[in-house]
Design a protein with these regions (language model features):
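Rossmann-fold NAD(P) dinucleotide-binding segment
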Residues: 55-64, 72-91
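Active-site regions of enzymes building and remodeling cell-envelope glycoconjugates
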Residues: 44-55, 86
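Active-site-lining helix/loop region of Rossmann-like oxidoreductase modules
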Residues: 10, 18, 133-205
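Hydrophobic/small residue at the entry helix of a nucleotide-binding pocket
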Residues: 15
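NAD(P)-binding Rossmann-fold cofactor-contacting core
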Residues: 25-45
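Rossmann-fold NAD(P)-binding glycine/threonine-rich loop
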Residues: 92-116
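Extreme N-terminal starter segment of soluble prokaryotic enzymes
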Residues: 2-7
Length: 205
């Protein structure tokens, strides 16, 4: 391509590293830099690591800023702030707060003539679309959602932000009795939080 989409990454945790890999494999994109509140020693791909306080110096050098911070505290502040000057994409996944996040981002982008896509990814995102498709072809059916067994990045991030916690991981595990009930056709009226076990492993400071 003659002109590639110029990408910036804000946040350099697990998600930021993953986005860096994906952008570098996309023929129509080029990574301009990685922005962080920390002073990073460098990046895996060799692109500049830039302190977030200098982000406005890149306003005309980046077409899309991909926000890779945590939903618990980062994106609610960084999203509206960065959307004043950049087109942004985020993976905000605190489901009950998505309408609030949408309203905040919508107001900022309209006021500043920018654009933002929120809650992009697997869940919410593609997983949400799959549920809609399922409900559309089986209108008399009932959808159940199970997560895991696996690490929840969002919940793990929330654990690590608790004072006194040095490190932590949270595993989301479907409860077998609910899996069996759904698979057998009996179903259940239990809410999603009852159908899962959230197992936390914490290292204190």
């Amino acid at each position: 391509m003659e002109k590639k989409i110029r990408i910036g990454i804000c946040g350099y945790g697990n998600l930021g590293h993953g986005v860096e890999l994906a952008v570098n494999r996309a023929a129509d994109m080029e990574l301009v830099g990685v922005f962080s509140r920390r002073d990073l020693p460098g990046t895996d791909s060799g692109v500049p690591a830039i302190n977030l306080k200098h982000v406005l110096d890149y306003k005309d050098k980046i077409d899309v800023m991909i926000l890779c911070g945590g939903s618990a505290t980062d994106l609610v502040d960084q999203g509206p702030e960065l959307a004043q000057n950049f087109v942004t994409v985020d993976s905000f996944d605190t489901h009950p707060r998505i309408p609030e996040h949408f309203a905040n981002m919508d107001a900022v982008t309209k006021a500043n003539n920018t654009a933002a896509i929120i809650s992009v990814g697997w869940d919410p995102g593609l997983f949400s679309l799959l549920r809609v498709l399922g409900d559309s072809v089986l209108p008399e059916g009932k959808s159940y959602t199970f997560w895991g067994k696996g690490v929840s990045q969002g919940h793990s991030d929330a654990i690590r932000r608790i004072p006194g916690v040095k490190n932590g991981k949270q595993y989301t595990i479907p409860k077998q009795e609910y899996l069996d009930a759904v698979r057998s056709g009996k179903g259940t009226d239990a809410p999603g939080n009852e159908m899962h076990l959230r197992e936390c492993f914490v290292v204190p400071e």
